[in-house]
């Protein structure tokens, strides 16, 4: 019984979250995409710099 109750509780909470959430506007979606892209580029550049430094120091 406890397993069934936990599943029903999860479904109930999921419905509530879906009811409250909304679809992002085009502008919001583009802003999130830009920020995510910039973050990926920054992480890539940092990794590239670290690999260059490691090659220079390690030989």
Curated annotation (Swiss-Prot):
Record has Transmembrane helix as a keyword: yes
Pfam families: SecE
InterPro entries tied to this protein: Prot_translocase_SecE_dom_sf, Translocase_Sec61-g, Translocase_SecE/Sec61-g
Residues annotated as transmembrane: 37-57
Molecular functions per Gene Ontology: protein transmembrane transporter activity
UniProt membrane topology term: Single-pass membrane protein
SUPFAM superfamilies xref list: Preprotein translocase SecE subunit
GO BP, one annotated term: protein targeting
Highest taxon in the source lineage: Archaea
First-listed, main subcellular location of the protein, grouped into a coarse class: membrane
UniProt keyword Transit peptide, yes or no: no
Keywords, ordered alphabetically: Cell membrane, Membrane, Protein transport, Translocation, Transmembrane, Transmembrane helix, Transport
Cell compartment(s), UniProt: Cell membrane
GO CC, one annotated term: plasma membrane
Alphabetical list of NCBIfam families matching this protein: PRK09400.1-4 (NF006909), secE_euk_arch (TIGR00327)
Function according to Swiss-Prot or TrEMBL: Essential subunit of the Sec protein translocation channel SecYEG. Clamps together the 2 halves of SecY. May contact the channel plug during translocation.
Subunit structure: Component of the Sec protein translocase complex. Heterotrimer consisting of SecY (alpha), SecG (beta) and SecE (gamma) subunits. The heterotrimers can form oligomers, although 1 heterotrimer is thought to be able to translocate proteins. Interacts with the ribosome. May interact with SecDF, and other proteins may be involved.
Record-stated family: Belongs to the SecE/SEC61-gamma family.
Protein name: Protein translocase subunit SecE
Species of origin: Methanothermobacter thermautotrophicus (strain ATCC 29096 / DSM 1053 / JCM 10044 / NBRC 100330 / Delta H) (Methanobacterium thermoautotrophicum)
Gene name linked to the record: secE
